[in-house]
Amino acid sequence: MKRLLLLAASFFLLMGMSAQERRADGAGYERKVVVEELTGTACGWCPRGLVGMKMLRDLYGDRFIGVAVHQFNATDPMYTPDYADIDWSDGGLKGAPCCMIDRNGEIIDPFYGSAGGMRDVAKDFERAMEEKAVLGVTVSGEWNADYTAVQTTAQVEGTEAGRYEMVFVLVADSVAGNTQRWRQLNNYCGYTRDSFDDDLLAPFLQGGSYGQQGDYCKYIFEDVLVGSSYKYKGTQYSNCLLYTSDAADD
């Protein structure tokens, strides 16, 4: 059994308000942006989403809050059925990989973004960062003795009155397994840079470190949704207890 590694207990608010911290200069809050991505190990084009999410993390650091929702295929060992009711299909027009930024209602590509160009999702992210942050959030988390649950607490302060819904999300990094179930389908392995000329996609292309492994490649997954307070939907609470799950290597 492999224990998932908790690296972040991400907290965000719906209505487009993501987790913020007061700026060091005292001028309001520094906006952080949530990107929820639909993905799955049986999604052959999802390496594009893996690349896009990593790019956002590398570019924007802790201002990026990534939530990789593995709901494309139930055979995915990271599959999580209990999450928000998001219409990822956008009325049947979209498929995986796709993402939504700060619950703005727009389903876009996690690499091409809304504009459709290489790496253009960064432009969508930057527009979201420019929006005013009206709430400040401080989150803390503590594991129990055997690392099967984490107690989370949030402190919220704001500059504007309003009704907000709070959601706790537990994500994990460096998630991997040794069996076939953990391998990522990679449709890019048969293509060269003549088709996809981008350094970030290159490892998944023909001859790349992942592409040379064939149709399925071994990958270490980041920002993986492990649990959320949606499991307790309708329950009032001051603290939220989120449970992890042990993931089998098979």
Task: Name every feature range the model reports, one short phrase each.
Residues 1-24:
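Bacterial Sec-dependent N-terminal signal peptides
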Residues 26-62:
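Local sequence-structure signature of Cys/Sec-based thiol-disulfide redox active-site neighborhoods
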